[in-house]
Design a protein with these regions (language model features):
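Predominantly the C-terminal beta-signal and adjacent terminal strand-loop region
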Residues: 75, 83, 87, 161-217
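Outer-membrane beta-barrel channels and translocator barrels
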Residues: 30, 68-73, 120-124, 171-173, ...
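Short glycine/proline- and aromatic-enriched beta-strand/turn motifs that initiate or cap beta-hairpins
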Residues: 23-68, 140, 206-217
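Transmembrane beta-strands of outer-membrane beta-barrel pores
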Residues: 39-45, 84-88, 117-119, 133-139, ...
Length: 217
């Protein structure tokens, strides 16, 4: 049921974004909407799970819709993203220390509201600085390499993640963004039992590269 609801919501937002694209001119006009499909790769980890480094590769696929403000505002654009995201963490078996391997996969829907400021970066030209907050809803979490049967009940279904990004237009049809995000709240539920995998609380942490496809110039 959750997966079907998520698919319906993605479809609705996609239809809205495509509708916004109709009638867009060759220049970005203030007080106008835009919509752009996005896809990205994510190197993630879960701080507090006793693994180190960005050890789990994930992804995000979704849609960004935005509204362009006048140049006199603090933000040039207010943008909303709706994405299907896979995060998690992974640790390989170490024969020297005999630590157990695990591979946590968390699939969730994420809705982000962000402000974007366009600034000049010298020879690099204009770049976008983005700061936003992502509201997350956990759809499914599983352990595929270790043994943790209670993992689904240990993790909270709802969460908050901060994201900061730097973006640039690299072609007529493509923007690229390098982003970093971190949980505002622990990803564990309040009723989670003590577990050796995450004794001090866990926080989603990730860096990624996302491409946004332009239909407007």
């Amino acid at each position: 049921m959750r997966r079907k609801a998520g698919i319906r919501l993605i479809g609705t937002l996609t239809f809205f974004a495509v509708s916004c694209l109709q009638g867009q001119g060759e220049q970005e006009k203030v007080h106008s909407f835009y919509g752009r499909p996005l896809m990205g790769i994510l190197a993630s980890q879960i701080d507090g799970d006793q693994a180190s480094g960005y050890n789990k590769f994930g992804y995000q696929v979704g849609m960004a819709t935005g509204y362009r403000l006048s140049e006199k505002k603090k933000f040039d654009v207010i943008e909303m993203q709706f994405c299907m995201v896979q995060r998690g963490s992974r640790r390989a078996f170490d024969p020297l220390t005999m630590v157990n391997a695990f591979h946590i996969k968390a699939r969730q829907i994420e809705l982000q509201v962000a402000g974007i400021r366009k600034v000049s970066a010298g020879r690099l030209g204009a770049i976008d600085l983005l700061g936003g907050i992502r509201f997350t809803r956990l759809l499914k979490i599983e352990e595929s390499e270790g043994y943790n049967p209670g993992i689904a009940s240990d993790f909270s279904q709802n969460g908050l993640i901060l994201q900061f990004a730097v973006g640039s237009r690299v072609s007529k049809v493509l923007d690229l963004r390098l982003h970093w995000d971190y949980s505002v709240l622990s990803a564990l539920s309040q009723s989670a039992s003590y577990n050796l995998f995450y004794p001090t609380g866990v926080y989603h942490n990730g860096v990624g590269l996302t491409a946004l496809i332009r239909f407007d110039n």
